[in-house]
């Protein structure tokens, strides 16, 4: 189905808006993946706050101009599926990585975060906000407990010297 100029402009504008509001982007090739599997991926993406779209490469190049994802232009070869993470930078990467494990034909081409091409593994392992807070609290709690133990040990040693 051929797209007229207005349709193309609408697609470019839509993808550009998604790119401007996104925290990260991941590019993949979904050739050979069944429609049923792609429907499952789209459903998972919606639930995770990820915007996914298959876009023609020429339209995608125009859509990402002037955004942080312009660095991905070299990966726009062949059928291109782009996913933008809206709530957490690693969400799209994590989603695509899990999907690629289950589907051999699904190939992740690249990812970008803060205007730079990043490794998908790096993005997928970024902690969520809640995980980061939990790690910080655990570290603080551990440090406080260790300091308290050292204080009691010093007090015990001081009392033993005095006796």
From Swiss-Prot:
GO terms for cellular component: large ribosomal subunit. InterPro entries: Ribosomal_uL10, Ribosomal_uL10-like_sf, Ribosomal_uL10_bac, Ribosomal_uL10_bac_type, Ribosomal_uL10_CS_bac. CDD domains: Ribosomal_L10. Belongs to the universal ribosomal protein uL10 family. NCBIfam families: PRK00099.1-1 (NF000955). GO terms for biological process: translation. Forms part of the ribosomal stalk, playing a central role in the interaction of the ribosome with GTP-bound translation factors. Gene3D superfamilies: 3.30.70.1730, 6.10.250.2350. Part of the ribosomal stalk of the 50S ribosomal subunit. The N-terminus interacts with L11 and the large rRNA to form the base of the stalk. The C-terminus forms an elongated spine to which L12 dimers bind in a sequential fashion forming a multimeric L10(L12)X complex. One of its GO terms (molecular function) is large ribosomal subunit rRNA binding. This is Large ribosomal subunit protein uL10.
């Amino acid at each position: 189905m051929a797209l007229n100029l207005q349709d193309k402009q609408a697609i470019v504008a839509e993808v550009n808006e998604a790119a401007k509001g996104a925290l990260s982007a991941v590019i993949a090739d979904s050739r050979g993946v069944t429609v049923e599997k792609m429907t499952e991926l789209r459903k998972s993406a919606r639930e995770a706050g990820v915007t996914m779209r298959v876009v023609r490469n020429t339209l995608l190049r125009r859509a990402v101009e002037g955004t942080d994802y312009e660095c991905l232009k070299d990966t726009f070869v062949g059928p291109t599926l782009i996913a933008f993470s809206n709530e957490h930078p690693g969400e799209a990467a994590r989603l695509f990585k899990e999907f690629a494990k289950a589907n051999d034909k699904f190939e992740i081409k690249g990812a970008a975060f803060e205007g730079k091409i990043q490794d998908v593994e790096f993005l997928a392992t970024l902690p969520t906000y809640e995980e980061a807070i939990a790690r910080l609290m655990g570290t603080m709690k551990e440090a406080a407990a260790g300091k308290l133990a050292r204080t009691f040990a010093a007090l015990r040693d001081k009392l033993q010297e005095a006796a």
